[in-house]
């Protein structure tokens, strides 16, 4: 969206595929700060990943999927994909299908009851990576709870700050648990790239 870490209007409009989205999402991704570049600096490549887990399909979360298209699979909630493909024209613009084209996208459905909505998906069946529905911002918005072997966990709550009151209450309760190492929301300018070891 920002070639060489510099704001460029035409590149952003082309990337977003929509002039209206451009007016609401003028983001500058600094040089070497794209997801594939950050992980390459740590010696990790998308081809090494078992999965990319999508919190939802809004443009600011799905527009860079081609950067991680070599991952073994890209997972998104079945209802979220249905919402993006069959929702209103606004949904189809803000969740542009071109961003998913050419990726190994697969859908998942709930297999657990974690969270205020009682809907979750245990990615590997071992409780270590659990996608938790936190509806509000979008129908299929998910947080990711990452749990270490000692029970400590990190909660990545995506755009949960725009969720329903029940979802926000669940996020707050999780953040106050003794074993919660971090509760991280997207779009928080105080959060800097880094690594958390569990």
Label the predicted regions.
Residues 23-37, 145, 149-198:
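Cap/insert and terminal regions of metallo-dependent hydrolase folds
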Residues 1, 7-9, 60-63, 83-85, ...:
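Short catalytic/ligand-binding loop motif for oxyanion handling, primarily in non-cytosolic enzymes
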Residues 1-2, 50-56, 76-77, 133-136, ...:
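Active-site neighborhood of phospho(di)ester-bond hydrolases with catalytic His/Asp-centered motifs
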Residues 25-44, 48, 78-132, 163-176:
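Metallo-beta-lactamase
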Residues 1-10, 107-160:
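Catalytic core of the metallo-beta-lactamase
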Residues 57-63, 138-142, 184, 188-193:
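Active-site environment of divalent metal-dependent phosphoester hydrolases
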Residues 67-70, 89-91, 197-198:
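Short, glycine/charged-enriched secondary-structure capping and boundary segments
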Residues 15-20, 24-75:
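Active-site metal-binding motif and surrounding structural segment of the metallo-beta-lactamase
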């Amino acid at each position: 969206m920002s070639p060489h870490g510099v704001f460029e209007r035409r590149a952003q409009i082309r990337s977003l595929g929509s002039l209206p989205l451009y007016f609401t999402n003028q983001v500058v991704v600094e040089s070497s700060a794209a997801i594939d570049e950050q992980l390459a600096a740590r010696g990790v490549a998308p081809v090494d990943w078992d999965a990319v887990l999508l919190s939802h399909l809004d443009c600011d979360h799905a527009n860079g999927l081609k950067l991680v298209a070599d991952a073994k699979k890209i997972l998104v909630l079945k209802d979220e994909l249905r919402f993006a493909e069959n929702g209103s024209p606004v949904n189809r613009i803000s969740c542009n299908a071109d961003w998913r084209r050419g990726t190994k996208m697969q859908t998942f459905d709930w297999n657990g009851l974690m969270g205020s909505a009682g809907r979750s998906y245990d990615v590997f069946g071992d409780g270590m990576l659990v996608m938790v529905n936190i509806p509000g911002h979008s129908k299929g918005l998910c947080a990711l709870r990452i749990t270490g072997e000692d029970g400590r966990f990190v909660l990545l709550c995506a755009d949960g700050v725009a969720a329903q009151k029940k979802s926000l209450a669940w996020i707050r309760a999780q953040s106050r648990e003794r074993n919660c190492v971090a509760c991280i929301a997207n779009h928080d300018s105080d959060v800097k790239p880094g690594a958390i070891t569990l």
